[in-house]
Swiss-Prot record:
Gene behind the chain: GMT1
Top-level taxon of origin: Eukaryota
Binding site for substrate: 145-150, 166-168, 196, 258-262, 289-302
Subcellular location: Golgi apparatus membrane
Record-listed E.C. numbers: 2.4.1.-
UniProt record, GO biological process: abscisic acid-activated signaling pathway; cell death; cell-cell adhesion; mannosylation; pectic galactan metabolic process; phloem or xylem histogenesis; plant-type cell wall cellulose metabolic process; protein glycosylation
Identification of the protein by name: Glycosylinositol phosphorylceramide mannosyl transferase 1
Species name: Arabidopsis thaliana (Mouse-ear cress)
């Protein structure tokens, strides 16, 4: 056999080998891709089956939730003003929450609640009765129209926990229950769903001056220093401190300006604890019209409040944090 023929045969063998190797690689790659896809699908199916086939997990968690910490549950403290349809919707919704003990409606209108309104709400609560326990409903009537009324001391509260909420905000009951669990782990602090932040002014001519910032600043920085009382848990003792111990000038300021009582409460709690508030992740449903936060000059007014309260307290008590409480039971990965 000549050298040319040997060379041709070797070239043909090399070409056949390369083609075979390419086919093998394609085969292995296709098999690997299919296997990986199969594993992913199997993982998802197994996870779903495991969650659905272990009802004892959720039931045991629910039992632990009911017996842990404050066995009496929490009091819903709802602020309202001439929005009766919203009030009815909110009370009807929260009456279904399993750990709710009572509802106190902060009433500051010049006329008392109508008998038809009271009858409607009481009937709603009767229909929502569970395990023989009917949620107590009370109207806390105030003669003066003041934002401070939402934090007026209630001496005969049965629960330590107070869930302060506006009448136009709805959270799923399981979300409220989770926030209550978080509060039970830190009952001296404020636990809520609506974070806000203050920032120190960097200019030299404004030493110890702070700017109030809203949600987008929190989202961008990942930092907050307060949670708003429009949707927050706190201990009932802070109602007494707000009413009896906080400087009267602050309460007068909030009454006159009709703003910032929520910031004042955040200052009060942070000053008492030297600890940050806790932000809880939760889907919020606002069923009312646009609030005062959309009115022009809102941020400037809130900034003025922050600096006024710093002067009253003699320091900035709010504490920065980046912690966020998330219910891992609702996440695939955590």
């Amino acid at each position: 056999m000549g050298g040319g023929e040997v060379s041709k045969e070797m070239g043909a063998c090399s070409l056949a080998y390369r083609r075979g190797d390419q086919k093998l690689r394609k085969f292995v790659t296709a098999r690997s891709t299919k296997f990986l896809l199969f594993c992913c699908i199997a993982f998802v199916l197994v996870t779903i089956v495991c969650r659905s086939s272990r009802p004892w997990v959720n039931s045991s968690i629910a039992v632990a939730d009911r017996i842990s910490g404050s066995r009496k549950g929490y009091t819903l403290l709802m602020n309202t003003w001439k929005r009766y349809d919203l009030l009815k919707k909110s009370v009807s919704h929260y009456a279904s929450c399993s750990r709710l003990d009572s509802i106190h409606i902060v009433w500051s209108e010049p006329n008392p609640p109508s008998e038809s309104l009271k009858e409607y709400l009481h009937n709603v609560l009767k229909k929502k009765t569970r395990d023989g326990h009917e949620v107590e409903l009370r109207f806390d009537i105030n003669k003066e129209d003041s934002l401070n009324n939402r934090f007026k001391e209630i001496k005969d509260l049965k629960t330590d926990a107070v869930f302060s909420i506006d009448d136009d905000i709805i959270f799923p009951c399981h979300t409220v229950d989770f926030a209550f669990n978080v509060w039970e782990s830190a009952p001296d602090t404020m636990v809520g769903f609506v974070p806000r932040v203050h920032w120190p002014e960097k200019s030299n001519d404004k030493a110890n001056y702070y700017t109030y910032s809203g949600w987008w600043s929190v989202w961008w920085s990942g930092t907050y220093s307060m949670v708003l009382s429009k949707a927050a848990f706190f201990h009932k003792k802070y109602l007494s401190l707000y009413t009896n111990s906080m400087p009267a000038s602050i309460r007068e300021f909030t009454t006159k300006n009709r703003n910032c009582e929520d910031i004042a409460m955040s200052f009060l709690i942070a000053n008492a604890t030297n600890a940050p508030a806790i932000w809880v992740k939760g889907k919020i449903y606002e069923i009312g019209s646009t609030g005062i936060s959309s009115i022009g000059g809102h941020t400037e007014k809130r900034t003025h409040c922050v600096n006024r309260f710093v002067a009253e307290f003699g320091k900035m008590p709010l504490v920065y944090t980046s912690m966020k409480a998330v219910d891992s039971r609702n996440l695939w990965f955590w």
